[in-house]
Regions:
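Interhelical loop and helix-boundary elements at the membrane-water interface
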Residues: 1-16, 23-316
């Protein structure tokens, strides 16, 4: 079976198209908010979208015909089911707002900024966000990594190991794990992308639909986003897109990928939270980074890498 086939090409096109949409948003954001928007960072995000699309067909270790069914299911979830569910949620929000127009006034961008500022006490020139905000951020960043680990362990040790389902479906536990991870991951990436499309619709003079975001999503954003990220693409999207290259490069060595993934989430979180809570010695002196944070991050990263390689790599 060819790598690029009727089941994989739609996902490739879907992600490259989203990359082009992100490029358009980046150009408009640079034009409208030149001081606030980080344009080089946005270009890197666009490149990650293109990379995720182009590399999608290479996830599976075999081109066996048995894999085709799982590629079909994955494509349906990523390109059809997930977008359809998002449309249904937004349609429900729209109907809800039509019945109660006061909701639209309450969900305006100005109100969001005002509530954010009220919750962001203690932010200084060297302290760009509070400990509580960073805790919410790191928890949100950890969520994709936790989902990936759970799906992989289920596929390899339960679906294949305990149930011996590979004998029925003709697909190894590792390939089934890849199917679960990329289906959930690529679908999740698009969900966060739609959140960005709506959140950053302020680039349009008449097409700002920020008000259609549900209240619980706005509350989560208010808790987890940095002030300087208001006019940038949201972090979880970038994080999951950045997982694509190491996941492919570490194919057959999931422990290596897991170590890198957990260092990027838990290790970075330990460094950041320790620095915010206990940091007293900035390095460099004009930076919000601290020596205490560096040390905690290094120790945490080493411990995480050791545990990931010991429990995940040696057991395969």
């Amino acid at each position: 079976m060819d790598t690029y086939n009727i089941f994989t090409i739609p996902v490739v096109i879907f992600f490259i198209t989203n990359g082009l949409v992100h490029l358009y948003y980046a150009l408009r954001l640079r034009q409208k908010f030149p001081e606030e928007h980080n344009f080089p960072k946005s270009l890197a995000v666009v490149a990650l979208w293109f990379n995720a699309g182009i590399m999608y067909p290479f996830f599976y270790s075999t081109g066996d015909g048995n894999v085709a069914f799982f590629q079909l299911v994955s494509m349906l979830f990523i390109c059809i089911i997930t977008p359809a569910l998002i449309v249904l949620v937004l349609a429900y929000q729209y109907m809800k707002i039509r019945e109660n127009p006061e909701i639209k006034k309450r969900r305006c961008l100005a109100t969001f900024f005002k509530q954010y500022e009220e919750k962001s006490g203690g932010v200084t020139a060297l302290k760009t966000h509070t400990f509580k905000t960073d805790l919410h951020r790191k928890t949100l960043h950890l969520f994709p990594a936790a989902v990936i680990l759970i799906l992989w362990l289920f596929a390899v040790h339960i679906w294949d190991g305990m149930w011996n389902s590979s004998a029925i479906w003709g697909v190894s536990g590792q390939d089934f794990g890849v199917f679960l991870i990329i289906t959930a991951g690529y679908s999740g990436i698009f969900v966060f992308a739609c959140l960005d499309y709506i959140r950053l619709s302020c680039i349009y003079d008449r097409g700002n639909v920020f008000w259609i975001l549900p209240d619980n999503v706005l509350n989560l954003l208010g808790k987890a986003i940095k002030h300087k990220e208001f006019y940038e693409f949201i972090g979880p999207t970038i994080l999951v897109l950045a997982f694509v290259p190491p996941f492919i490069l570490a194919h057959g060595a999931f422990g290596v990928f897991a170590a890198a993934m957990l260092i990027a989430t838990i290790g970075d979180g330990v460094a950041s939270l320790t620095g915010l809570k206990f940091g007293k010695h900035s390095f460099p002196k004009d930076s919000h980074k601290t020596i205490e944070g560096y040390v905690a991050g290094a120790i945490g990263s080493f411990a995480i890498a050791f545990l990931a390689l010991f429990f995940l790599e040696s057991k395969q």
